[in-house]
Amino acid sequence: DISDKYIETINEKTWIRDDIKPYELFLKTLYEYFKEEINEDKNYDWDEILPDGFMNLQYQTDAVIQAKKILDAYNGVFISDVVGLGKTFICAMLAQKLKGRKLVICPPVLKDYWERTLQQFDVQAKVESLGKLDSILEDNDLMKNIKYVFIDEAHRFRNEKTESFQKLHEICYNKKVVLVTATPQNNFSSDIANQIYLFQPKNNSTIIPNNKNIERFFGKLDGRLKKLEKGTVEYTETLKDNSEIIRDKVLRNIMIRRTRKEIMEYYKDDLEKQGLKFPNLENPEKIIYSFDDNIEQVFNHTICKI
């Protein structure tokens, strides 16, 4: 039997009450779902953390909090904001919050930039170029003690059949991985899948509920494309459909990606604080080129080969 005291408690001390409107219940549901991120933001004094001269921008601090949550849940996260939104700064702020030894792997031309940025944010980390994977593997102390691996331009490792991918996979084994790229996928689903395999087991994944075999999931999507002729309408439509499935089933759980349009819509105050305006892109205009006979012949031959 249900006691009167139990009924009284339900009616007066919970959200299951007649005077609670559906919209209020909806807001309460949102709060309960996102309260970790909301409360986490209150725990950080970003102005104390940021180096002198760096602005406290909400779109960057939000990304740090979300990235840490994803990293803890799945052992890896994609930071894939479009170009120009400060992915390196977001990574440096994230690294501040992570306890444990860190390794940054980046293109040689960006090595000095990464080292300067991490120094500005008072982050201790080993920075190595993409061409030094062998040196990393040979450093037993480093390999034993690394807890986090940051990979800049991670899209370079889309092909698991390459030697560099195999070396990187060995480096990342049993580590938490941060993949930094604005272009994680090119054409095939395997582009994104191979990068995910750097931090998730193929046959024991935790990303898709009730579907541990993520290799089979991506294999089915790639199989749909391989049956079609590249360049056809059906191929293009299938490619779009595959991308939507991947976004809905996989990337929404492990990727942070904001476009300039989204920043303008949801973080307008940040843009005003920076005095930043994104350029308005005009519609493309057709430009006709004229070649002499020899160049035109070479051009046409090249197009046919492509």
Question: Language-model segments: what does each one mean?
Answer:
Residues 1-82, 89-97:
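ATP-dependent helicase/translocase motor core
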Residues 55-76, 121-144:
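Conserved helicase/translocase P-loop NTPase motor core
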Residues 84, 155-158, 183-185:
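Catalytic acidic motif of RecA-like/P-loop NTPases
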Residues 90-93, 99-119, 186-190:
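Conserved Walker A/P-loop ATP-binding site and its immediately adjacent core
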Residues 99-101, 146, 173-176, 190, ...:
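Short glycine-/polar-rich loops that comprise or flank the Walker A/P-loop
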Residues 109-127, 199-203:
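Conserved helix-turn-beta segment of the N-terminal RecA-like "Helicase ATP-binding" lobe
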Residues 130-145, 153-157, 161-174, 179, ...:
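Inter-lobe coupling linker of SF2 helicases/translocases
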